[in-house]
Amino acid sequence: MRRSLAPSQRGGQRLSSRNDFTPPLLKKNKRACQQDLEQERLRQSALRDATNTSDLPLPIRFTANTEYEMAIAKVLARKFKVPIDNYVPDYGGNRTLGVRRRIVRRPLHDPLACNALVLYHAPNYTDHERMSMEPSSVLVHVVVDPLLSNILRPHQREGVRFMYECVEGKRGNFNGCIMADEMGLGKTLQCVALVWTLLKQSAECKPTINKCIIVSPSSLVKNWEKEFTKWLHGRMHCLAMEGGSKENTVRALEQFSMNASTRLGTPVLLISYETFRIYAEILCKYEVGMVICDEGHRLKNSDNLTYQALMGLKTKRRVLLSGTPIQNDLTEYFSLVNFVNPEMLGTAADFKRNFENCILRGQNADSTDKERDRALEKTQELIKLVDQCIIRRTNQILTKYLPVKFEMVICAKLTPIQLQLYTNFLKSDQVRRSLADCKEKASLTALADITTLKKLCSHPNLICEKIAAEEKGFENSQNILPINYNPKGEINPELSGKFKLLDFMLAAIRAHGNDKVVLISNYTQTLDLFEQLARKRKYGFVRLDGTMSIKKRSKVVDRFNDPESDCFLFMLSSKAGGCGLNLIGANRLFMFDPDWNPANDEQAMARVWRDGQKKPCYIYRLVASGSIEEKILQRQTHKKSLSSTIIDNNESAEKHFTRDDLKDLFSFDPDILSDTHDKLKCKRCVQNVQMKPPPDDTDCTSHLSQWYHCSNNRGLPDNILAQAWTDSKCVSFVFHHRSQSQKIETTPATETSVEAKPEPERRKRPAMPLSDDSADEDFQGF
C-alpha cells in the first residue's frame, strides 16, 4: 500500500494527470501582478460598456445569456466609488491596512492593588489631556514589585520610600541618604527593594539606573548575594567579587563597567571595601547608576584611601547603611554626610567654622550661658539640616515581630589566683612608671598595661608568657600559680571566675534543652581557650575569626543555623564577624570581654536577636567585678548617655585617657560587689538590695540606672543563670532588663512569659553630640 506520492513510494511510475497538484497560492513577481490587475480592469470595463451578450468577454458570455443575467453582471462589474466628496486617492502612500493602535503608557505594577507601595504618584490626566500630549511625555506611577511590597513591614515600607525620594532628589537638592536603622530592622531587604525598583522602572516608563555597586565588608559579600536570590526568587543575578585571580577580576570589572546596556545580565556588583580600593581605577572610569555602602561607619575618616576611592565614583545616587549612630565626633558626622551629599554641609573648613567650633565651646565646663545657648542653637540647626537625608529607627520596632530579649550584665568575682596577680601588678613599679610617664595622654607603656589587665581578667593563661618570663609586674608570680599548672595542657576553668561561670552555664544549657550558644571575644587567644573548653566537655562547635576565608564563612554560618546540626557553640571574633552575620540558630550569646567602643559590642550582640528568631533570647555580658573591665563598661555607658566627643577618627578611646583617668583605671577594690553600681549611687537600692523596680516605660536600651539590680539570684529572668550563681559561687552582682514591656516574676525560679506587649513604632532622629542627662535623677555620672 502506497502511503504518499514520494518517489520512493511511486516505484518510479509517473503520476497521472488527475493526481497533478497545483498549489493554491503561487508567488508571483510584481510584473505578473500588474498584468493580472490590468486584465481585470479591462474585463470590468468591457462589462460596463457591453450592450448585448455578444459584446461580453468570452468567459461571461455563456452565463449572461439573458437580460436578467446581463443586468447582474453589470452590477458586479460596477467600479467602487469612495463615498467622500472630492476624494483623491493616495496611490503613492505607505499606509497599511487597519488603524495603528495608540500606545498607552501604564505602570509596571498595579498601583491600586492590595499592599501596593507607590513610590511616585503620577498626575491624574484627563482623557483630553492624554489625547493632546505626546506619548513620551506621559508620566506613570512607580510601584514596588508586589513580590517585595507584600512582605515589607510598615517601617520597611517607610524606609524604601524615604530612600527613593532622596536618591531621586524629591526631598531637596541632593541625591544621597543615610539609612541609620539599628541592627536587625531589615536594611538589606529595603535596599533590595530600592535597587530592584530603580533597575526596572521610572516615571518615564524606562529603567532609572542600569547598574548598581554595593560595597560591604568582605564577610558580607556572599550574604548580599543570598539576600538578592532569596527575596527576588532568582529573577536577577549579581556579580559577586569574592576571591579569584587578578586577571579574572580585572576582566569581570571591566566588562561590568563598560556595559551601558539596560539589559545587563548582572546589573548589581557586590564587592568588598578592600577589593574596591584596589580596582577603583577601573570602576571610576564610567557612569554608575547608584552606589550603596554597607556598614558605612567605615567611611568616618575622609582622609583614608577607601573614602577617596569611593568619592571618585561617577554617580550622584549614594546610599550609606550603618546600624550605629554617629554620636562621638562631629568630624565623623561631617564625613558621612559629606560622602552622600557633598554640597549639603559645605567644605570641612566651613563645617568647622559654622557648627563644630560653636558646639564644642558650648560643651566646655567653663562655657558661658551665651556660648551654651549658641551651641544649642547650632545643634538644632545642624539636626534640621541633616534630618532631610538621614532616617533612623530603633530596634524597639522589632518587639512586635520577635520574641522577648533579656540582656544581663554579670559581674563575676576574680578567683584568688587572679586577685593576687591583679593586685601585685597594680602595686608594681611598672604601673607607677606608667602613671609617671603620662602627662596629657596615655603612654604606650600604659596602653600595654591596660591590655595585660584585660587579659588577666579573662584567664591567667593569656598572660602565662609574661609570668614565665618574669616580666615587670610579674616578678615571682610563678609561685602564685598551682604546682601542676601547665598553660599548654588542658584548660583549667577554675583559675578564672568568668570561665568558671561560663563552664557551669554551658553545662546547664546543654543539659536542659536544645538551645545553641554564641561565644564572642575581642581576642583570638580567648577563642583558643573556648576551643579547649569545648573539647574538654565534648561540645560540638564552629569557629569564625580573621583567618577564615570569605567563602568558608557562609558555609560555617549555614551549618550552625541548621536545626539538625550538632554544633552547640559558635565561637566568634568580634573584629572579624561582629557585623552583619545572622546567627539565628542560637538564642543565647555570651559577650566575654567588653570593647572600648560601645558600637562594636552592640553590633556583636545583635547577631542572634534578628529576623527569623523564634526563641526568647538571652544576652550575657561578663565583666570581672571591680576590675578594669567594669571601668570600660562605665565609659561605654557614659558615651551612650552623654554623646560626648571622646573617640577620635580611627583611634581607640584608651589613647585619650588623662593621668586622672588612668589612676581610676588602675584602681581596684577586691571586696566590692559592683564598682559600676556603686558609682551610679542608685536611689532605688539600699545596701545593694533593690527596693523599687525600674519605671514601667524602660527596657534594655535604657541607662543601667534604669535596669533591675540584683545582689543575689532572686528575681533573675533566667533559671540557667540563677542556678549557676548558686553552683559556681563566683557571681557578685547582675544588672538585667528585657526588650519590651513584660511582667517579670520576682521568684527564685523565675518563669518568663514570651508574650510581649507591642510598643508603638518610633521614628527617632539621629543622636547628636550634645545632650543633657540632668533629667535622670539616678544618673550621677562615672
Swiss-Prot record:
Region (Required for chromatin remodeling, strand pairing activities and coupling of ATPase activity): 2-9
Residue stretches in coiled coil: none
Keywords linked to the UniProt accession: ATP-binding, Cell cycle, Cell division, DNA damage, DNA repair, DNA-binding, Helicase, Hydrolase, Meiosis, Mitosis, Nucleotide-binding, Nucleus, Phosphoprotein
Subunit structure: Interacts (via N-terminus) with spn-A/Rad51.
Annotated binding of ATP, by residue: D181, E182, M183, G184, L185, G186, K187, T188
Known function: Involved in mitotic DNA repair and meiotic recombination. Functions in the recombinational DNA repair pathway. Essential for interhomolog gene conversion (GC), but may have a less important role in intersister GC than spn-A/Rad51. In the presence of DNA, spn-A/Rad51 enhances the ATPase activity of okr/Rad54.
Post-translational modification Phosphothreonine, affected residues: T22
Region (Disordered): 1-28, 741-782
This protein's encoding gene: okr
Location(s), subcellular: Nucleus
Provenance organism: Drosophila pseudoobscura pseudoobscura (Fruit fly)
Domain of life: Eukaryota
Residue intervals of the Helicase C-terminal domain: 501-658
One Pfam family named in its UniProt record: Rad54_N
Bias type Polar residues, positions: 1-20, 741-753
Amino acid composition bias (Acidic residues), ranges on this chain: 773-782
Name of the featured protein: DNA repair and recombination protein RAD54-like
Record GO terms (molecular function): ATP binding; DNA binding; DNA translocase activity; helicase activity; hydrolase activity, acting on acid anhydrides
Alphabetical GO biological process terms: cell division; chromatin remodeling; DNA synthesis involved in double-strand break repair via homologous recombination; double-strand break repair via homologous recombination; double-strand break repair via synthesis-dependent strand annealing; meiotic DNA repair synthesis; reciprocal meiotic recombination; response to ionizing radiation
Family affiliation: Belongs to the SNF2/RAD54 helicase family.
GO CC entries: nucleus
EC number from the UniProt entry: 3.6.4.-
Top EC category: hydrolase
Short motif (DEGH box): ranges: 294-297
Domain Helicase ATP-binding: 168-343
